[in-house]
Amino acid sequence: MPSPYVVAIDPGHGGSPTSDPTQLWDPGVVVGSIMEKDITLDLALRLRTLLQRERVKVVLTRSSDQYVEISERWNRAHAAGARMFVSLHVNAYDGDSTINGLAVFYPKPDSFSFAQAIDSGLAETLKRFQIADDGVAIKPELWVRTDVPTVTVEPAYLTNPRERSLLLQDDFRDAIAMGVFQGMIAADPEIEQTKVQLAHSEAAATAQHLASAAATADAARTATATRWGLIIGGLAVLFVVMRAAIRRQSRLPQPPAYRRRAYRRRRSVSRRY
């Protein structure tokens, strides 16, 4: 069976304050009670669901509210054999709440086409929400250790009141996840090819399993029929033997009736005298 296509999804930031001052945590952008870390994790889980439906193996750099070092995030992706790396964030701009829009960043030139595919997917799914598309931009300081196509996605500004309101809505989050998903699928046709190969292999394995189960059932039925045949055959032989014995018994000579009566009469006479 072919190996699944592996991707890494990185929900930015994470962790919560504890009584241990040495325990690090990073909420990301915070506006009131809304924290970037919670939004990015939710987006990652939605995106994972979409990818898994396509038989893609998804590695999350974090799957709960925990702090993970940047180097460890990449180590987890690399150890799993990820062939794409998508880091999810939301944007912010201090001092001007009117700044808005979608942006996709990439760390190195070899990730440019990947960034364009992700940006195109998001621009399409967020069009109905009237989100401005700022396009793609290179940021060499981002994820410099990666050796696979890598992007950082900033779909909206948490500091913009309108976009903040959208970020709290399920349909907007679904649209973000769908846009990133469509961009990933478009970026590498091998994702779809692997899906087809896996589907064929699974179908063949299922057919083989069903054939094996049917053969086992046939063998069991044959064995049962054989056992019943032996039992019935044995009973038939026993019946024939018993019937022959009964017939032989019925052909044995019997004393005549008058002899039996005379014998009884003589015994009666002797008792009188």
Model-derived segments and spans:
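Active-site histidine-acidic residue metal-binding/catalytic motifs
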Residues: 1-74
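Active-site-adjacent mobile loop/cap segments within catalytic or ligand-binding domains
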Residues: 5-8, 18-22, 80, 87-95, ...
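A short, glycine/acidic-enriched catalytic loop
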Residues: 17-35, 92-120
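Extracytoplasmic/secreted envelope proteins and their assembly/folding machinery
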Residues: 41-44, 48, 71-74, 101-102, ...
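Active-site-adjacent substrate-binding region
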Residues: 110-137
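Juxtamembrane/start-of-transmembrane alpha-helix segments at the extracytoplasmic/lumenal side
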Residues: 214-234
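Alpha-helical transmembrane segments
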Residues: 235-249
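Cytoplasmic C-terminal tails of single-pass
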Residues: 250-273
